Amino acid sequence: MTARAKTTADLAAEYGLKPEEYARILKRLNREPNPVELGVFSVMWSEHCSYKSSKKHLGKFPTTGPRVICGPGENAGVIDIDDGQACIFKMESHNHPSYIEPYQGAATGVGGIMRDVFTMGARPIALLNALRFGDPSHPKTRRLVSGVVAGIGGYGNCVGVPTVAGETNFHRGYDGNILVNAMCVGLADADKIFYSAAPSAGLPVVYFGSKTGRDGIHGATMASQEFDDASDEKRPTVQVGDPFAEKLLIEATLELMASGAVAAIQDMGAAGLTSSSVEMAGKGGVGIELDLDAVPQRETGMTAYEMMLSESQERMLAILKPGREADGHRIFEKWGLDAAVIGKTTETGQLVLKHKGETVCDIPLAPLFDDAPLYDRPWVEPVLQPRLDPAHVPSPSMGEGSGLGVNAPTDVNDPMRRTASSASLETSANAPPTPPFPHRGGREMTWRQAILTLLACPDVASKRWLWEQYDRHVMADTLHDSATGADAGVVRVHGTKKALAVTSDCTPRYVQADPYEGGKQAVAEAWRNLTAVGADPIAITDNLNFGNPERPEIMGQIVRAIDGMAEACRALDFPVVSGNVSLYNETNGSAIPPTPTVGAVGLLSDYAKRIGYGGLKAGDVLVLIGATVGELGSSLYLREILGREDGAPPPVDLAVEKRNGDLVRGLIRKGLLRAVHDLSDGGLILAAAEMALASKVGVFMDDLPEGPAHAVLFGEDQARYLIALPQDALDVLDEAAGDAGAPYHVLGRAGGCEVAVKDLFAIDLDDLRAAYEGWMPAYMDAPA
């Protein structure tokens, strides 16, 4: 394709532009664009780059705070962590590429998010991920899991950055669109942050990193479209990563910054050279002129269109200070990187591209950068689920005799095990009878079976198979990771007593049932997870994953989820400093469950005071912080045991969240607690089982809160923590809880080798561990 080729509305549509958008281009230019210019417009106006459907609503987020140095709008967010140091972090999606080509899609997602962080002057110190796959029985799921996990581990391990936390879910709603959200956290000096805005005209523009190839062309456009049955044909739009080149790029970039030569810098991510050059010039209010013949190329005969839209990985664009080209050349040569001066900033306000002696693009930057189309799309209020009365939700049965483990559990090593539900009832003494238990398999399910089934379900079961493929301890600063029994990863700030706590969270089934409450809960759970390791929650990044925003019901999910998240951020003093929006996650008109993922960072001033849920000791007292109502709507129990996905999610009272979290954090700082676990999926009984397994100590609960036993044990009420403390600390707890006005309930004690509730069940730790550890390896090792 040449610059002389005629552009048509059909070509614009092929590039992802709507007819009204093409008409807008004609009006702005007062002429027809050539194919190169049209390609530039198409990627800069894509949903992926412009946020044209969501930008109106993203403004609801609070983005400032006492620790915020830089909020949304740059490559990543920056927060102050004291002592002249800053934490730089962001989360971003690589959903569409990972479905098409799972290994490279996931690997380049990791590489891209690291570049966002070190582009601002930070050394990456931690990686996280949030993964959503389809139903385990779907024919593509196992291959996608294998490829994505290998890609994440293969890239992060080679670069030498530990993967310390994350979450993995399975649901049929992701059969046609998996989600791969990657997060990176880095450290920098607070007074040495680098930004992307070009400071003035007349400065050299330098390309460095890997050569440009034809991989990833129109990747940003592909990420702004839904899939259909021909999705595999989009494989050429997936980028190919080289982690060893990334490692060299990190070192060269940080050395270049330390030399004082950098005036502005931007990585080449989505839309490649187009977005990096347009954003740098646009933010600085200058023009930019590039000589594409000077761009390092790994393939012959590349056109201007291909070079501008390529998304080849491990590339950077820098604007250097006057006369500093030689410094850059020396550093790039040292690290073996391709590099060239490919242009300059100008006073014209135009994007000018030259190739083979011709001007192949000459368009104003304004409509590309700050005058892209913005839509106020129509939306409708989501249809909400009614609240479920826990007394009307079936309970497990006592089974034969006492119910103390009398029936064998479902075979947890069956890799294609579908959750089973059964028939009978059980109530606590003070609750009305519950209805018969309608198990889909037609068999009665006991308490023992229900608990083992939940522990072995794909969303809860140990992901050891997965995280053992990640290097969690490279850099030697990891204090808590996926293996240590904690609600958040914890990484030491090297050479100090400080540590950063990091987590990623979302409960899609809550957002599906009520986007507003689900949005609040995603933020609140991230806040709880940081609290549960002893950290002060500071700020969040987000990754908003939704379907097609042109459908009013999907746009309604987006609007209300953002509303809920924004309210939670304000109430918890938890500003949003960076983020990403991934839309059009649907195939043949079937959208994913709405998944607004939250990545969060907290600070421990003394990492010696960190805590997890694996420190339980025999004789410790188990205490539940927070009130128990027994909310079973949209719960894991309802889905995995009863085969239902209905009911309103548990409501989130943000004032109560803050009160209870502040109480727990204060108790941790006083050194009173042995173990802390926030309550989430599966409620109290799963939190107790996970604490017992991590600590290798049993628990016995002989005094449950009031209510139907199954609602008390499986209910997912929010703002709750399970804590363990010595007997002699109870008086201090009572005083602190009284001062805070926070309810608590003494449940029982630690000891023995069972998880037991008086008069209901007792399950040996070995059986619990077999259920918890068995599903994932059995699934991944099963024949295809």
Language-model segments: what does each one mean?
Residues 2-15, 19-21, 25-38, 177-178, ...:
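Glycine-/charge-enriched secondary-structure boundary and capping motifs
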Residues 16, 243, 655-658:
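Alpha-helix N-cap/helix-start motif at coil-to-helix transitions, marked by capping-box chemistry
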Residues 45, 49, 58-108, 112-118, ...:
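Non-catalytic terminal/interface segments that mediate subunit docking, oligomerization
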Residues 74-341, 345-350, 354-355, 369-370, ...:
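Mobile "lid/hinge" segments at catalytic clefts and subdomain interfaces of large enzymes
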Residues 4, 8-80:
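N-terminal amphipathic, basic-rich helices that act as targeting or association modules
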